Swiss-Prot record:
GO terms for molecular function: ATP binding; glutaminase activity; phosphoribosylformylglycinamidine synthase activity. The gene is purQ. PROSITE patterns: GATASE_TYPE_1. It is found in: Cytoplasm. This is Phosphoribosylformylglycinamidine synthase subunit PurQ.
C-alpha cells in the first residue's frame, strides 16, 4: 500500500505521519508537495497537522485552494481513504469534504496534552481495529479545535453514524464532544487529536496506531484478498 503525506507551507506534523507509516506500519509513503496535481499513484492520502500558510484568514482557508486539494477531492470521490489530522481536519472542512467548522477553543488558549477519546463507530475503514466504546489516549495540540455544526448537521451526523470519536472530557468546547467525523461515504476522516503521535510506546503510547492499521486492513481486504 502506498501513502501520500501532503506537505503545505507551514505543515509541521508531516514527519510524524511519515514515521507512523514507514517505521510503524511498514508501508510505502512519500512526502508530496502541495502543488502536485496528480495523486493517482497513491492508495491513501494523509493531511498532516501544523499551521499551513500561517493559518492566515482561517485555519485551512488558503490550503483548500492548493493544486493537491483538487487531487484529494478526486481521490475522495474514488473512495480512497483520506485522513486529515488537526490542521488537516480544518483543511477538509474548508474544502467541503466534511461538514461543520473548527473554531477557537472555548478557553481561547492553545492546548497541548494527552486526552481520552471514546470510539463511537468502529465500523469505518479508520476504526475497525478498535472496539466500540473503547477509550484511548491520544495527544492534542491545537488552538482552533472547537468543532461546530448546526443542529440539522449534528442530527445527520448522528443518524448516519458519522461520529468516529468523542472526547471523554471535552477540552475545547466541541459540540456534542466531537473529536472526529467521517463523511457520508465513510472514506474521509477528520480528527483534531493526533494518532500519528501515539504509535510507539517509547513516545508515550501506541493507541493511535490502530487508525493506520485499520486503513491497511481495509485496503488489503479490498485489493489483495480479492485480487
Amino acid at each position: 500500500m502506498k501513502f501520500a503525506v501532503i506537505v503545505f507551507p507551514g505543515s509541521n506534523c508531516d514527519v510524524d505521519m511519515f514515521h507512523a507509516i514507514k517505521d510503524e506500519l511498514g508501508e510505502e509513503v512519500d512526502y508530496v508537495w502541495h502543488d502536485r496535481e496528480n495523486l493517482d499513484e497513491y492508495d491513501a492520502i494523509l493531511l498532516p497537522g501544523g499551521f499551513s500558510y500561517g493559518d492566515y484568514l482561517r485555519c485551512g482557508a488558503i490550503s483548500r485552494f492548493a493544486n493537491a486539494m483538487k487531487a484529494v477531492q478526486k481521490a475522495a470521490e474514488q473512495g480512497k481513504p483520506i485522513l486529515g489530522v488537526c490542521n488537516g481536519f480544518q483543511i477538509l472542512v474548508e474544502s467541503g469534504l466534511l461538514p461543520g467548522a473548527l473554531m477557537r477553543n472555548e478557553n481561547l488558549k492553545f492546548m497541548c496534552r494527552t486526552v481520552q477519546l471514546r470510539v463511537e463507530n468502529n465500523e469505518t475503514m479508520f476504526t475497525s481495529q478498535y472496539e466500540k466504546n473503547e477509550v484511548i489516549n491520544i495527544p492534542i495540540a491545537h488552538g482552533e479545535g472547537n468543532y461546530y455544526c448546526d443542529e440539522a448537521t449534528l442530527k445527520q451526523l448522528e443518524e448516519n453514524n458519522q461520529i468516529a470519536f468523542r472526547y471523554v472530557e471535552n477540552p475545547n468546547g466541541s459540540v456534542s464532544d466531537i473529536a472526529g467525523i467521517v463523511n457520508e461515504k465513510g472514506n474521509v476522516l477528520g480528527m483534531m487529536p493526533h494518532p500519528e503521535r501515539a504509535v510507539d510506546e517509547l513516545l508515550g503510547g501506541a493507541e493511535g496506531l490502530k487508525v493506520f492499521q485499520s486503513i491497511l486492513k481495509q485496503w488489503r481486504e479490498t485489493y489483495v484478498v480479492n485480487a
